[in-house]
Amino acid sequence: FKSVGTEGSSGTKAFALTGNVVNTGLIEVPMGTTMREVVYDIGGGIKNGKAFKAVQIGGPSGGCLTEAHMDLPMDFDSLKKAGAIIGSGGLVVMDEDTCMVSIAQFFMNFICNESCGKCTPCREGTTRMLDILTRITKGNGKPGDIEELRSLAKMIQNSSLCGLGKTAPNPVLSTLANFEDEYREHIFDKKCRTGSCRSLTTYVIDPAVCKGCTKCARNCPAGAITGELKKPHHIDTDKCIKCGTCKSGCPFGAIKEA
């Protein structure tokens, strides 16, 4: 068993490979195998020919690493230096359409639910971090949120009693380290580049492309689209619930995300 792996991390490790990758499932590889080998050689690359964006490694309290880390050997020491952990062996591959702020919120929500509540830093700190992340994804982020997230993360890491609390901030810290520009877009520009955060998405109809087929108006569950047959239609942004039904159903590609 010790004949494979690295000097500091011998043997093999089982990982659960999932996400936006062609081949998913349980795999067992020698410690020190690179993420590139796992994602592309074993996983078959990214689905639908899209670009790789990140991989979340180590379970819910693991870290999100980028293309720059693809040749990093997956062993205990290397991942710790990169701000991640091997943890439970989860490997969630994400493509270019993934919002990293939303991902951080998703994992922080899981961590909040898993906290036993015994120590205040984990119980209250993670809840506060989740509140901030939720507010940011809903378009209500404000200056100082990034700094507060980092401050809370440091406090939780240093003060929590168990391993869950000490690693709980990893999803936020790693996405801040590698994708801070996305946080700033959400907070200051009120924009989600992937369109994942619906509260930050505004749908508009291009009058030069719209044929007035009325399909969007008929399918809109909120009755937010009006217009006459064979004439450009219009979306009432106050009524729009941002479900995306109009965009996905438009046969002419006339509906855009502003």
Protein language model features and the residues they cover:
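Redox cofactor-anchoring modules in respiratory/redox and cofactor-processing assemblies
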Residues: F1-T202
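Extended, hydrophobic alpha-helical segments in both membrane/secreted and soluble proteins
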Residues: M35-V38, A51, S115, R128-M129, ...
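Glycine-centered helix-boundary capping/hinge motifs
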Residues: G43-G44, G139, T214, G223, ...
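Ferredoxin-like iron-sulfur electron-transfer modules
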Residues: F107-F110, K191-G212, G223-K242, G253-A258
